[in-house]
Amino acid sequence: MSYSYPFFDDVYAYYNQTVTFFGKALDVLPGSPIVKRYIKSSYQNDPLRTFIEFLLLVFAAYYVLRKPRTSPDNNYVEFTEKEINELVDDWKPEPLVAELTDVEKLELKSIPVLESVHLHTKLIDGRPITNFASFNFLDLAENKHITECAVATLRECGLGACGPPGFYGTQDKHLRLEKDIASFIGVERAIVYAQSFQTISSVIPAFSKRGDILVVDEACNFAIQKGIQISRTTIRYFKHNNMKDLERILQELEDDFVKHNRPLTRRFIITEGISENYGDMVDLTKIVALKKKYKYRLILDETWSFGTCGRTGKGLTEHFGVPPTDVEIIIGSLTTSLAGGGGFCAGSELMVEHQRLSGMAYIYSAALPASLAVAAYEAISILSRDGGSMLNDLRSKSALFHAKLSRNKFFETSSDIESPIIHLRFKDKDISHDKQVFLLEEIVELCIAEGFLIARAKRVESLERVKVQPSLRICISTGHSAEEIEKLALLIKEKTEIVFDKHKVINQV
């Protein structure tokens, strides 16, 4: 027996008419037979299932195409004009920079302004001054021939290179400078960077990556610290210029490699020729022997020793009689003794060419101005010819200051007797760090008032790995006379006595 429901019959009839209508409309569209055939084969002519899915399709289209309804924000609070003004008046913005410390205020207050870079010049107010704070160790910044060559190049090539060396920044002047540096030191190749500071901070990460090992002097300069930080390498520090501690660390690493059968990695020892923070000299002979024994490569930063050490200024390799090829990577500065600009890295051809595509500072920085490149290779030419006499003069004047300093009861120095950078530190270690800074700054000001410019070694203490005792930094140059050096040594002693008496500081040593 079959039952009939008129309502459902009407709905079903209406549905069939609708489907027939849309079916005819669908026939007009290209590819509709394929769709209809797919529907029939998929749902086996089940109209109810097709109807339900059609409703879902209509609902989805409605949901996507409908206009979004904005709901009222329950957290919105409407303020009156008076309340807004009160909130604005009460608001205290945070300062963009932290308030200056007492030390920073003292530093900003006591910055001298000079008329020129010469060793004998004037302050901006016209008072004569002898500059013992300049890194112009060989007095080449005042060399007339170098100045004339630099000016002529400036007129020919313009001020800047206006592009990185790898694109269009390299000029024939740069190529000659690289060739002259390599020839002067006695290595295969050299590469020139636009800034001295960024040279070693770029060279280290170019060769050392995550998983490699760096054994570094704990008192290394800030540029080295930045380089090893960028490299993300495993780092071990040895005590400053302590070869026994260095050998202990190398042996520990070797034992660890053997014990755990670790894979072979790149391993470097990093140190300075003359320490920027202490002025003392590393034992290159011993460190080369250790790096050969334990199969390490050596990165030697000669920023302060190139142009100041050795018979003709070739650096520590010449000073100790070590073949320059025994040092894999030699870093040097062109801004000190050579009176130019930038820095360089010298060594094997393979090592140098690797940096042209991997040295970040070489790739992304504009090339060294051509005029500074010319000044540097003209200075190298002078060193090649007259370096022997110039270096003898520099060493004798450094030794003279050391001799006069030995009579000073307030200061001691860790600087090597042949180093032109001399750090003077208080013998009394009980004086607090900040008080030492204030005392040294006052001594500097008193010396400037007497016509001698010296400087306190300044560092960003919060960024330094090791806190170094404050010091006066004296820079000796061949342009200084023996009388000036003797007078400065006596003046520092006199002014220190005045400052100690003024602040009632009792020298405990």
Swiss-Prot record:
Residues passing through the membrane, by range: 45-65, 327-347, 363-383
UniProt keyword Signal, yes or no: no
Disulfide-linked positions: none
Pathway: Lipid metabolism; sphingolipid metabolism
GO cellular component: endoplasmic reticulum; membrane; serine palmitoyltransferase complex
Enzyme Commission numbers on file: 2.3.1.50
Alphabetized Gene3D superfamilies for the sequence: Aspartate Aminotransferase, domain 1 (3.90.1150.10), Type I PLP-dependent aspartate aminotransferase-like (Major domain) (3.40.640.10)
Membrane topology: Multi-pass membrane protein
Compartment list: Cytoplasm; Endoplasmic reticulum; Membrane
GO biological process: ceramide biosynthetic process; sphingosine biosynthetic process
Broad class of the protein's primary localization: cytoplasm
Keyword Nucleotide-binding appears in the UniProt entry: no
GO molecular function, one term: pyridoxal phosphate binding
The reaction(s) this protein catalyses: L-serine + hexadecanoyl-CoA + H(+) = 3-oxosphinganine + CO2 + CoA
Matches recorded under PANTHER family: CLASS II AMINOTRANSFERASE/8-AMINO-7-OXONONANOATE SYNTHASE (PTHR13693), SERINE PALMITOYLTRANSFERASE 1 (PTHR13693:SF2)
Family assignment from sequence similarity: Belongs to the class-II pyridoxal-phosphate-dependent aminotransferase family.
Protein name: Serine palmitoyltransferase 1
Species the sequence originates in: Schizosaccharomyces pombe (strain 972 / ATCC 24843)
